[in-house]
Amino acid sequence: MGRYSVSPVPKCLLLMFLGWSGLKYYEVNAAQLREYHIAAQLEDWDYNPQPEELSRLSESDLTFKKIVYREYELDFKQEKPRDELSGLLGPTLRGEVGDILIIYFKNFATQPVSIHPQSAVYNKWSEGSSYSDGTSDVERLDDAVPPGQSFKYVWNITAEIGPKKADPPCLTYAYYSHVNMVRDFNSGLIGALLICKEGSLNANGSQKFFNREYVLMFSVFDESKNWYRKPSLQYTINGFANGTLPDVQACAYDHISWHLIGMSSSPEIFSVHFNGQTLEQNHYKVSTINLVGGASVTANMSVSRTGKWLISSLVAKHLQAGMYGYLNIKDCGNPDTLTRKLSFRELRRIMNWEYFIAAEEITWDYAPEIPSSVDRRYKAQYLDNFSNFIGKKYKKAVFRQYKDSNFTKPTYAIWPKERGILGPVIRAKVRDTISIVFKNLASRPYSIYVHGVSVSKDAEGAIYPSDPKENITHGKAVEPGQVYTYKWTVLDTDEPTVKDSECITKLYHSAVDMTRDIASGLIGPLLVCKHKALSVKGVQNKADVEQHAVFAVFDENKSWYLEDNIKKYCSNPSTVKKDDPKFYKSNVMYTLNGYASDRTEVLGFHQSEVVEWHLTSVGTVDEIVPVHLSGHTFLSKGKHQDILNLFPMSGESATVTMDNLGTWLLSSWGSCEMSNGMRLRFLDANYDDEDEGNEEEEEDDGDIFADIFIPPEVVKKKEKDPVNFVSDPESDKIAKELGLLDDEDNQEESHNVQTEDDEEQLMIATMLGFRSFKGSVAEEELNLTALALEEDAHASDPRIDSNSARNPDDIAGRYLRTINRGNKRRYYIAAEEVLWDYSPIGKSQVRSRAAKTTFKKAIFRSYLDDTFQTPSTGGEYEKHLGILGPIIRAEVDDVIEVQFRNLASRPYSLHAHGLLYEKSSEGRSYDDKSPELFKKDDAIMPNGTYTYVWQVPPRSGPTDNTEKCKSWAYYSGVNPEKDIHSGLIGPILICQKGMIDKYNRTIDIREFVLFFMVFDEEKSWYFPKSDKSTRAEKLIGVQSRHTFPAINGIPYQLQGLTMYKDENVHWHLLNMGGPKDIHVVNFHGQTFTEEGREDNQLGVLPLLPGTFASIKMKPSKIGTWLLETEVGENQERGMQALFTVIDKDCKLPMGLASGIIQDSQISASGHVGYWEPKLARLNNTGKYNAWSIIKKEHEHPWIQIDLQRQVVITGIQTQGAMQLLKHLYTVEYFFTYSKDGQNWITFKGRHSETQMHFEGNSDGTTVKENHIDPPIIARYIRLHPTKFHNRPTFRIELLGCEVEGCSVPLGMESGAIKNSEITASSYKKTWWSSWEPSLARLNLKGRTNAWQPKVNNKDQWLQIDLQHLTKITSIITQGATSMTTSMYVKTFSIHYTDDNSTWKPYLDVRTSMEKVFTGNINSDGHVKHFFKPPILSRFIRIIPKTWNQYIALRIELFGCEVF
């Protein structure tokens, strides 16, 4: 018998010991135990550290009290030395797949804090996050470690969460304190976590495959939200502001792994740029890393150009606020390992491109044509020069291309409207050399800086914030009237990757003062192409048309020419107040290619053409620019989407196939300014080129128009002056210097002289969008927009018969005949007005109790038929949808018909993303030149009905076999911003063929749709103007009382997210908010991959505006977990929910048959005779052994079970009964359930009807089991018989488990616990029987079927060895019968240990004394007790205290493994 220790122990220390004493069992299987000793401690932090001699003279105003993570030696007495570069960041934690990370944490601060990882496998007591997950005290110690206390966190790096095949060697995540996300982060509690592939780390933790690795955190600290408040907003890299980040060091030809973290407690984006360098991210070549607050990125870079290079976020406010540092690349004598030697044949393909570009000052008209459809308010604010505003014309500087170095002959006579304000397109493929002869014809210094290629310092053309004036070279700032030549070669390390488009989109601009130069107008597009992507004419080989769209925000208030513009265009310049918010706003121009409104001309394309779009975001914008393409989809990075998100100063290349006739809109999705200013219409037309074959007549004009877009060399010399495109002696010399030419191949020189004839000129112009050239040169140059057609775009559309009414069925039929393999799916959806309540609020401190939470809104609701009389009630599968409209499901090649009824009080419509539709089913209003017949869909009046018809082409669905369904959205498009904030939005799921069942649900997958949105009720149609926030509140940034961050419109408490462990769960995530609505989704305890991109592991998912993401998860940890945004302020205010993972073996009898459920817990609407409800127990015996009732007309009988706690129910077993020889049974039934006994829900399941009817019994004895899916959580269950034989009769068992999980049998009854693992103080043995401890198994049959001790006294015990640390949550006890003697234990206590030596009694939490449990009252019944808190132990003993006749025990233990 072991030694007992019952001396009082402090509760927290006891629980901590219990939680981690079993760690040794986990060490055996670990590839490596990586131990870290980390403390949270107070530190005075200076964001702008001064040199030591200066810091002694004055105390910085940028010193703040922070809490930071620091690494210590084992005894927490000596802090470990750390890299100065790490700044505020905690130590970088690293682990390979198979490792275990053990973090010994001590809190030296004055606030409770924790450590929570964004990605790792952990148990509840290593999560480091506090929320209502139903766990016990022992599992909550990690949530918030008090000051002065310690805790040990254990994280497992499993293959399931490790980097996938396509991932880099190490993935970047963050760890941070999760007690209060906003205050903890702003106080400084954050560090980096690198999860790496097996074998990728050296013994010291560094990466094997890189020369260097660096962690940089781009962050915004709001010191007013620090625990130690001091108003200040700091824009930093690793906590350093104003360029004080210590220089990042590298050697030429180093391969560097970058681990970049973005953090802010409010929504924030970062455009991370390394001047003069290119990077590779996820197998795509980039020059700017797109980063959002709360997410991380891993990228790599190979460097070759020496010098000191700027590291910055190109978001204008970040640069101005000092978020920058430097990368210092030195020549360390390393060999060039980056440049591949070329054969002579490869060398011959190298081209030298020479451009002559000038900076010139012009008067720019942002809206030369203002269509009548332009919004009046927008026009008054931005385009009119009333109220002493400047208006739409401004003096600006632009890049202009010339034919030669004389700069007297522009490549065009009149400024081409199609290009807008952009400079000429610069194109080059890998290994080409580009020379830009730049002449500054403006009145102040300018330069040219290019993105996306590696350049030397003399070709950089950029002035840094810290550059002293004496160090500004000629190339960095070209003075007025001066000329400078920028020259560089596109290196192998700059080449687009295999996954990239043929040409990737970059930009160039002046960078003397980047913000002001761009605001003045100096921008242009740059294409970096693969080595075979361009023809010798500079035209893309794999695209019919190349199209550029630059979404630029010109802040004219920051232009060099503001004073000039005020003097020239304001009616009373002397009275202008430049700091007046209205005046300032009027000068911020949202443009597409420099145009701030729609144009009367329409960009035109041929039907079936493949258009390569190059889209870029430029300017002072500090938000994402979501670009929406109507009627078509972008193919970008292997994914079809109709919204592309552009980060500031970055570009995307996308392919669009013109396959939908009509006039459509390319526009920015989001704010009023963006959607009105950043837009252009384009025509997808099916017509014959009437001028085909007339090239000779148009020869001269063709030359002129080709000149505009083809490379300068082509323009510079015609037939009489041919262009030398490739290798000449000079280029060979350059190639040799760069190591590109093999010595053995350098034996001859080659001149590939090409002459451009007129046919080629016209071909180039045609590829660039110019279909025909008529009339004079001047006329053509005034109308360069491709196919700027004035005629009716639909005149030749064979689908339209103006004499007949629109018939939706005919449209659907035509689609189906075209495809010949789809189905028609019909939906009936109405817009209805409701009162929506955002309460209950989960955290009272977040919002004032007096704040209004109930608002009038409009929502989409599904109906059963076209009468719109009977709503289609949502069931368990729809419970989580909240404010979302019904899910519209279809398979690829289907046709969707939606009959829409507007039951609201104002016009609404339906607009679908991702699907194919005619103009008559678009559901959006703009000047698309449609006939009236095609405009009826734009806005359906109140009480009106309209049928939308949408086709599902293959591009709308999953892209490969691993993807099951793809998500899109629909919403009202009358005014998308106001309509969505009013509540009118719903999901579309497009699935593979055969994935949808007869009930219109997906087969064999569990799916959820989550809509992340900050609802701004002030943007709703129904919000009273009198209640809106005042202008003063908006100016000072007061958080609106009327904004509600929520998931599916429900803050904190979204219901219905229940799933099984290890099943495939598909989450469809939507974000249709504005440009600043950025959410980073984190599922605690789980990891996931994006559908179609399973080769990449995700820990968190950035969800950008207009994003529809489908992710796949295999939940590995049972319990209730937190789903949230990593944007702290939104998380704190309600953008979070709980999801429950249930054990796949959650089908345990809940206790009707065993008697655990007592008679008093069973009730009914009535009964007949002695057939009382308490008898309704499965397999009950006796004359009266069931519940039975006589059903009377108009009565609806029921039987109810009160489980006395909320549990998970996954199945129901039913049985009838026999009365003499008569069978009594229920043939069919449905059931209802409730959590409180007041509000009852009818189970609907997969059925489309109002309730699901279950098949009952076919006789009075057979057991029928029905599976309940989805599983439900309830306390009360009622069964309602609807069909029966003779009488409604039930014997019942409910199947399920505990909500908290960890409630599966541990193996006594099943035999999983071996006989040798069950021991006792003694056991009874006679000549005819032996009552050994191994017989103490629940429900064991036989003559000797339990454990009996040798003697009956209080010193006896039964012991079970569970072999490893186990969480034990409950116990069932049972007695036994010997002959006619009934034996059972009436009371008992529990002791446990982890070392089989020092035993501890289980204590009563109320008295802190040993708890005595009530045992059995008979020999065969079951009694179940729950351990709250649970026991964490390997060994457990049951000690009988009192008994009936003799001690006899049969038991089962319930729980789960700890690790």
Curated annotation (Swiss-Prot):
Cleaved propeptide residues: 772-817
Subcellular location: Secreted
Gene: F5
Native source species: Pseudonaja textilis (Eastern brown snake)
Tissue: Plasma; synthesized in the liver.
Protein name: Coagulation factor V
An individual GO BP term: blood coagulation
Pfam family, one: F5_F8_type_C
Domain F5/8 type A: 32-330, 351-685, 823-1142
Residues that, per the record, bind Ca(2+): 142-143
Gene Ontology CC terms: extracellular region; plasma membrane
Residues carrying covalently attached carbohydrate according to the record: 156, 204, 242, 300, 385, 406, 471, 557, 783, 943, 1000, 1179, 1396
GO MF, one annotated term: toxin activity
